[in-house]
Amino acid sequence: MGHLIPQTGDEETELGLAAVRLANCAAFPMVFKAAIELGVIDTLYLAARDDVTGSSSFLTPSEIAIRLPTKPSNPEAPALLDRILRLLASYSMVKCQIIDGNRVYKAEPICRYFLKDNVDEELGTLASQLIVTLDTVFLNTWGELKNVVLEGGVAFGRANGGLKLFDYISKDERLSKLFNRTGFSVAVLKKILQVYSGFEGVNVLVDVGGGVGDTLGFVTSKYPNIKGINFDLTCALTQAPSYPNVEHVAGDMFVDVPKGDAILLKRILHDWTDEDCEKILKNCWKALPENGKVIVMEVVTPDEADNRDVISNIAFDMDLLMLTQLSGGKERSRAEYVAMAANSGFPRCNFVCSAYHLWVIELTKQA
């Protein structure tokens, strides 16, 4: 029996179908999150990776069920997995074939970006970021967006008893561990180190807001002559492992910043208001020599919203994430970064290169 595809043909029908899809848009991310947490994505990825002949990569829902890290006690699990997987297949996350009247599934290449346990060390994973984004704590925050528009305030605080995001995370060990694992950092950093040569000649590199220090770990592994100072709040450093040539230093970037030849701000400025960013940058200015520089790594929003451009989608998605999670946090345009740099004492703001969705921006004291 073939696919039952409704005849569209006219513009009104196409628009109506697009509207119906939008009305049901919550289903895909929540189902995908469950598939990651269950280990379905890892299971399919491993089957495809270990299949030399290409003949056994496709698995039935029953075969997937028995390979999951936690074996289901529910006898209906294979049928439920089938329903989950056919939705993922409709979004091109997995491949689906029908063999002997039964659906079988295989991982698509994009699955390697969403592994939970068998993470590709050359790539990193976005699984934790997706899980955090769809955590109840953050879902409740989205429910306050309308009220923020009408009445003001901060969505995260309104939904979480007035607490700020980073205060909340410091008190929630589960969320803190997930938060520190989030993102696509490995792949992005590897790409940046391929295309950006600005770390050459740096002797002391300070990573302000460096978290657990993984960014400096990557940089110093390529540039072993660099002494790295990983600078963050005490609570952020509690889970920080040891890295060669990296010293963990606790402090507050709004008070002062350790001295270095160069200062790195990776995904820090988007957390704060323009006024707070200028305070941070002025402290960086004080900590740098005359020929020093700040290396900013951030999303840069395009001036126009283009529905055909995935970078626009990512930039504006992240901007709304900042709006709901933080007080005054936002993604910024080129013009906004140039103005912010000038207001903080940096006459030169150079957009050097990009890697995936992040730009590398150099701010220097000398024009």
From Swiss-Prot:
Keywords: Methyltransferase, S-adenosyl-L-methionine, Transferase. S-adenosyl-L-homocysteine binds at G209, D232, D252, M253, K266. Its EC number is 2.1.1.-. InterPro entries: COMT-like (IPR016461), O_MeTrfase_dom (IPR001077), Plant_O-MeTrfase_dimerisation (IPR012967), SAM-dependent_MTases_sf (IPR029063), WH-like_DNA-bd_sf (IPR036388), WH_DNA-bd_sf (IPR036390). It holds the Pfam family Dimerisation. One of its GO terms (biological process) is indole glucosinolate biosynthetic process. PROSITE patterns: SAM_OMT_II. Pathway: Secondary metabolite biosynthesis. One of its GO terms (molecular function) is O-methyltransferase activity. Gene3D superfamilies: Vaccinia Virus protein VP39 (3.40.50.150), Winged helix-like DNA-binding domain superfamily/Winged helix DNA-binding domain (1.10.10.10). The active site is at H270 (proton acceptor). PANTHER family: O-METHYLTRANSFERASE. Belongs to the class I-like SAM-binding methyltransferase superfamily. Cation-independent O-methyltransferase family. Involved in indole glucosinolate biosynthesis. Catalyzes methoxylation reactions of the glucosinolate indole ring. Converts the hydroxy intermediates 4-hydroxy-indol-3-yl-methylglucosinolate (4OH-I3M) and 1-hydroxy-indol-3-yl-methylglucosinolate (1OH-I3M) to 4-methoxy-indol-3-yl-methylglucosinolate (4MO-I3M) and 1-methoxy-indol-3-yl-methylglucosinolate, respectively. This is Indole glucosinolate O-methyltransferase 5.
